[in-house]
Amino acid sequence: MVWELFTRLVDNSFLLVGPMEAFRHIFLLMEKAAFFRILSFSSFRILSAYFLSFFLALAFALFSYQHRFFENLIQPPLFLLRNLPVASFVIILLFFIGRANLSFFISFWMSFPIFYFNFLEGLKKLDQDVLEMARVFRFSPWNRFRYILIPGIYPQMLSSAKLAMGLSWKSGIAAELIGQVRNSIGYQLMDAKVSLDMGEVFAWSIIMIALSKFFELLVLYVLKKGFSKGSI
């Protein structure tokens, strides 16, 4: 295993620990009473932001598709948000909101532009002949949404859902770390770093990656089952 090989080459537990040591720390963390409370704290805020950004971005993209002025109005601030460094955004938000919900706002604003621009791109690529057919046969707004719009943006929905999930977790945990949000995964990472406990740093990192991947696969499964053929 490459990780184990590098650990043996470095041979310094203050810099790098092996996989067995990292997983030993995971089991030690799981024995602590606060472990699942910490997971719940971070997961709830990050996932709430992710799903809210998904549905709001879909609504905004649909409105922008129908009203060009709205697209021109919100594109500049969204481009700014998409390119603003997480650290700068965290510091700015600390002046306006409390630390407890910092990861929610950061995860939301990092994932919203991804969803919005991908959904809008998919809508602009819709087959105009199909849309014309829907008008001729007088599809209701709901049926147009269900049978044409959603299947039409399905590829963009999958790609953006995957990309935004990873970014939501990375930016959310980074916000917790920078903002020193207590009872969060980010705070535990910072505390382990200050204590020079690399085993715990790797343990929390593995936990974060595992949670991100688990929910990514879960969301993709739901989208593939529910949206691929407009079955909503």
Residue ranges and their predicted role:
Residues S48-L78:
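Transmembrane-helix boundary motif in ABC transporter permease subunits
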Residues F79-I114, E121:
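Generic hydrophobic transmembrane alpha-helix motif, especially the helices
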Residues F95, S171-M208, S231-I232:
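Glycine-rich helix-loop "coupling/hinge" segments at transmembrane-helix boundaries
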Residues N118-M157, L189:
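Short cytoplasmic-facing helical segments at TM-TM junctions of multi-pass membrane proteins
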Residues L9-F51:
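Periplasmic/extracellular loop-to-transmembrane helix junction in inner-membrane transport proteins
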Residues M1-V10:
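N-terminal signal-anchor transmembrane alpha helix
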